[in-house]
């Protein structure tokens, strides 16, 4: 039993374990509602990490929106931080892994989740926040919609600034931008020795490009490079060419080549020069579903097993809206 701000919760199990703490699956005694509680022992982690946890609470409170995971309340007791949040059905990473590796993710799903991610990241950027660790595991599926989570290493950019210098941990290597690895004033050939690096909103755009690439091709742009040192060199090398094959290289059954406009979006997001990358707002202005897409008859349908995972978490009107959107191949309103 855990008590947070006078409310009792029954612990049902563990949802996850991170470097700074654990996330528990709980049930509120009074209402029976299922929740997730993030528990962090602030006395057992580094000062910078503890500060990041407290800043995450502040950001969750400030960034409240349908596209951001909801924080209901929090409390600090005897150096233990408890954050009560809504519980999702699964995260995007697990959902993607649940699909057969021999099947390509349907284009309708790619476009749906891509626009959901853009909407969430655009919201935090509009509020001056750089996430710094965008990856499929940090997008939670809640009642059929994606919500952004984990602001532990996010940063706030002041209105009169365009970037921030960070001394905290980097994001996940397969999704990290070149500028987040390069040392300030360095030559870009190796990671920073002092762990200090400079990022801006375009760093999140690179990460989004890596996620889109993985949705389309089944792996991130640098995932085929096994050694971390070689991967770092490739990411930071401005002359490294990222492959955007029009045909499948993994021989998955039923593969459909990505439409040219989607390859162009990936190319723009994965520009080594961050100034050449579009903003998230600009990415949202692209008509992802419409004249640029293949005919509806050529688009693969969403497997029933995946639809069933989405259906049970939607209200009837939301489920009907999703079906209509997939049928007409146009974004949800």
List the predicted regions and their residue ranges.
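Activation-segment/catalytic-loop signature of the eukaryotic protein kinase fold
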Residues: 74
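Activation segment signature within eukaryotic-like protein kinase domains
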Residues: 113-114
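A conserved loop-to-beta-strand element in the N-lobe of protein kinase catalytic cores
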Residues: 78-86, 93-94
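Regulatory extensions flanking the kinase catalytic core
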Residues: 276-320
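Conserved N-lobe beta3->alphaC-helix segment of eukaryotic protein kinase catalytic domains
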Residues: 40-63
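Glycine-rich ATP phosphate-binding loop
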Residues: 22-42
